[in-house]
Amino acid sequence: MLGIGAFKQRIPCPGEALPGREQALPLHNTHLINGHPLRGEFTGLAQVQFGLGCFWGAERKFWKVPGVYTTAAGYAGGQTPNATYSEVCSGQTGHTEAVLVVFDEQAVSFEHLLRTFWESHDPTQGMQQGNDVGTQYRSAIYCTTQAQYAAALASRDAYQQQLTAAGYGAITTEIGFPAPTFYYAEDDHQQYLAKHPNGYCGLGGTGVSCPIGLDA
């Protein structure tokens, strides 16, 4: 039997992943900052999932962006349904910590969100982000439309040129379409840094400017 450490740098195969559960984790369905629902159909609004390390700091990056309707912390990209935080930390779910971003395309462009994403972390680090090591910290963009997917790929290529010029390696960000199921994290993780202002935030960008979304 493989130990937990075996999955810190490798995503488990479906047969290796924890089974999870059918029932979603309990969730207080109101955003602590803006009062909007965390879960819903969000008719007339766009959605995207971003993974950029620990979701506590990542979610705060996006709830501060004007035009973002709501945000939520969760797990995506793996095999285990309705995983718990401890299960995700084991590396045996395949999930990355992700932020669901629901936004009004008339108020903020997808390119602006992409720029926020790229500049808020180091997308060249593979299965870690700073001192946070494991598959749950991998960089990811999970798109809900073909147009988002094309824009995400184009932004990656544009940012790679800037990173290369600054001496960084290859971008390891996972970019996918269609977006996988987003499993909401436990209630305490939602808007965590608003509940715990002195809480941990390990996010750190490269300092390299992303050449998209400048006029958004």
From Swiss-Prot:
GO terms for cellular component: cytoplasm. It is an enzyme of class 1 (oxidoreductase). One of its GO terms (molecular function) is L-methionine-(S)-S-oxide reductase activity. Pfam families: PMSR. It catalyses: L-methionyl-[protein] + [thioredoxin]-disulfide + H2O = L-methionyl-(S)-S-oxide-[protein] + [thioredoxin]-dithiol; [thioredoxin]-disulfide + L-methionine + H2O = L-methionine (S)-S-oxide + [thioredoxin]-dithiol. The keyword Oxidoreductase applies. The keyword Oxidoreductase applies. One of its GO terms (biological process) is protein modification process. InterPro entries: Met_Sox_Rdtase_MsrA_dom (IPR002569), Met_Sox_Rdtase_MsrA_sf (IPR036509), MsrA_MetSO_reductase (IPR050162). The active site is at residue 54. Keywords: Oxidoreductase. Its EC number is 1.8.4.11. Has an important function as a repair enzyme for proteins that have been inactivated by oxidation. Catalyzes the reversible oxidation-reduction of methionine sulfoxide in proteins to methionine. NCBIfam families: msrA (TIGR00401). Belongs to the MsrA Met sulfoxide reductase family. This is Peptide methionine sulfoxide reductase MsrA. The gene is msrA.
